[in-house]
Amino acid sequence: MSVLTRYGTVIYGRTLEGYAANMLRSVILAAARSSRIERLIGTAPVSRSLVRRYVAGEATADAVAAVRTLAADGLLATLYYLGEDTVAVEQAHATRDEYLRLLAALDEEHLARTTEVSVKLSALGQRLDAELAHDLAREICAAAADSGTTVTVDMEDHTVTDSTLEIVARLREDFPSVGAVLQAYLRRTEDDCRSLAGPGSRIRLCKGAYREPESVAYQRRLDIDRSYVRCVNALMAGEGYPMLATHDPRLIEIAVDRARWFDREPDDFEFQMLFGIRPTEQLRLAAEGYRMRVYVPYGDQWYGYLMRRMAERPANAAVFTRSLWSRS
């Protein structure tokens, strides 16, 4: 149950974190980095069906088709080409090239006005050379602007937070609509929300899905939820455009209340949800007049993304476990 006040929100809920659920989440996030488990999962009979639930497809045409369907239902979209932790310059260039093809396709199909793209800097070589990642991201931003849309730069683990925000700041000098992502489970994020929610800013707030040490990130679900609400307040009080990424009914209800309190109209912020998760709720929010954007991943590098989705929803892991024992 949540209790709303005029100056903030206090959440009363499960006071005891499920120890088993936390342990399972840690195991899943560790497995997300394991190439051996990736090979095992890739051969499981159920893998492809679960992948299709969360991933639009492997090709550019699949991504465009998914966006077309969402647009027909009154939903906005952000497209993400799966891939991260690039280890070669050529791979970073290939990722850039795919985004350029994607943006050209969106423009040709007249879908760019309702669709932005999300980019991970590590897929553009951030860990090899931050300047390379900036330059390639800049090319993507320029192509997006030419197509009539924009870019949101995804956030990854805490080791690249400062580098990512620095690159976003540089990109915004020429492309002011470029968005950033902040993760509520990081202890620093409430301050980041206050400092970054200036005029023209676009901030996507999510809970966070990477494995982080307690020194930098809240570990209990209750603490993460409370941080999320404090961050919502900071963004709603700011002068930017909040993009609230959550599937949690409590947090959606709180966000609607906070928007009213800060005199924000339904088109002055948006909700975001992942492709394949709570589609009925996505349609409900859009029908009620809220801007509802769906995060749509595509491509063949789905393993790490899917494992983080399972970590967020550990019940999904049971389906995979059963499939591994029943492989033919």
Language model: regions and residue ranges:
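Positively charged, amphipathic and often flexible ligand-engagement surfaces
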Residues: 4-328
